[in-house]
C-alpha cells in the first residue's frame, strides 16, 4: 500500500507524458478518485527509464505547509522499494526542492 494518498495534478503533463504525480501527506483517509485541494510543499526529482517523472509532495489546503523528515524518508523508501522489484527498470531519485520550485514545475507542466 502507498504510504500517503497518491494521485496527479489535474490539467498537467509531465516529462513522461502523464499528468504530474503527487503525494498528499495527510493522516486523512481519501477515497480513490477524490479530488482535493492541496498546497505543493516539495518537488522530488525522479528520472525513470530516461524520462522525467518528478513527484510533487503536498499537503491538504488548510493544513500546516510542512512535510516532515519522516514523511520524506517514507516516500523515498517507498519509491525505491517499488522499483527494486521491476527487472530492467532504471530509476533515479534526485534533489528535493522546496515549494517555489514545486509551483514552478506545476506551472511549467500546465496544459
Q: At which residue positions do the language-model features occur?
A:
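Hydrophobic N-terminal alpha-helices or hydrophobic patches in metabolic proteins across all domains
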Residues: 1-111
Amino acid at each position: 500500500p502507498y504510504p500517503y494518498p497518491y494521485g496527479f495534478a489535474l490539467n498537467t503533463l509531465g516529462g513522461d507524458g502523464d499528468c504530474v504525480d503527487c503525494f498528499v501527506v495527510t493522516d486523512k483517509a481519501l477515497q480513490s478518485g477524490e479530488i482535493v485541494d492541496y498546497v505543493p510543499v516539495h518537488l522530488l526529482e525522479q528520472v525513470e527509464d530516461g524520462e522525467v517523472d518528478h513527484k510533487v509532495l503536498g499537503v491538504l489546503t488548510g493544513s500546516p505547509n510542512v512535510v516532515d523528515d519522516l514523511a520524506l524518508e517514507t516516500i523515498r523508501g517507498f519509491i525505491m522499494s517499488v522499483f527494486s522489484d521491476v527487472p530492467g527498470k532504471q530509476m533515479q531519485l534526485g534533489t528535493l526542492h522546496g515549494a517555489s520550485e514545486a509551483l514552478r514545475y506545476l506551472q511549467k507542466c500546465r496544459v
